[in-house]
Amino acid sequence: MERLLVFADFDWLDKPELVGELCYEKLRGSESYAFRFDDNWLKFHAGIKLSEDINNYPGLQYTQPGNDIFGCFSDALPDRWGRTLLKRREQIQASEEKRAVRNLSSFDYLMGIDDFSRMGGFRLKRELDGDFINVSPSLKIPPLTELRQLVLASQEVEKSEENDVLPEKKWIAQLIQPGTSLGGARPKAGVLDDR
């Protein structure tokens, strides 16, 4: 079973606080998700309901059969454009590593999004004392001055999609950080305006 520690980084908190643990398991083609609140979160924030499908009590809670990931986490998942970028990255990596392409789950998509641009107030860690996942000092959200390059990269990925071929790795690498967390089907990317 894979797991991620979920932290709340809400604007009213002084610092990120551990909310609980999100677990994922795939058995015989069937995916299941479970969530367990941290005792301290329940002690101090029991009045905050994160999602209609997670109740504020201790112990493991599972998604309903046939349901994907819990609602509060699905809000942070990429839509079609972000999923396309993450799928193509997986295909390119599989080709380079000479292995079969993995089918990505909602858990994979959640882990694949840049920490800075992930929608909502959740941050994720593998280990309690570890770093937040997908915090990349070298691949930050680009400045507004790189907008033309992002448009070109998006156009190249779209051409590849139309022709049903893998895009070049450089185009995907350029778009993964700024382009996976925003919703919708059309190409888009977040940029920073330093002014």
Walk through the language-model features, giving the residues of each.
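Phosphate/dinucleotide-binding and metal-coordinating scaffold of catalytic cores
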Residues: M1-R195
